[in-house]
From Swiss-Prot:
Localization in the cell: Secreted
Proregion residues excised on maturation: 23-52
GO MF term (any one): toxin activity
Physiological role: Omega-conotoxins act at presynaptic membranes, they bind and block voltage-gated calcium channels (Cav).
Disulphide bond pairs: C53-C67, C60-C71, C66-C75
Family the UniProt entry places it in: Belongs to the conotoxin O1 superfamily.
Keyword Isomerase: no
Leader peptide range in chain numbering: 1-22
Keywords: Calcium channel impairing toxin, Cleavage on pair of basic residues, Disulfide bond, Ion channel impairing toxin, Knottin, Neurotoxin, Presynaptic neurotoxin, Secreted, Signal, Toxin, Voltage-gated calcium channel impairing toxin
Annotated tissue distribution: Expressed by the venom duct.
Protein name: Omega-conotoxin-like TxO2
Organism the protein comes from: Conus textile
Record carries keyword DNA repair: no
UniProt comment concerning the protein's domains: The presence of a 'disulfide through disulfide knot' structurally defines this protein as a knottin.
Length: 76
């Protein structure tokens, strides 16, 4: 019974702490996300969603991720 109460209090405390510490940053993060999405709507060719392969020097797992088709930990 005591352990259950301690766990419940700990979860409530951590939840409250998360909301208190994240509140000032979360609104700014959403604003930056909105501005980036708005920029991509105005310039669709600049959108990262259109990129289907990685440029040389970018880390990779398989060769089919790289534009060149060659991957040795980084795109060649």
């Amino acid at each position: 019974m005591k352990l259950t109460c301690v766990v419940i209090v700990a979860v409530l405390f951590l939840t409250a702490w998360t909301f208190v510490t994240a509140a000032p940053h979360s609104s700014n993060a959403l604003e930056n996300l909105y501005l980036k999405a708005h920029h991509e709507m105005n310039n669709p060719e600049d959108s990262e969603l259109n990129k289907r392969c990685y440029d040389s020097g970018t880390s990779c797992n398989t060769g089919n991720q790289c534009c060149s088709g060659w991957c040795i930990f980084v795109c060649l």
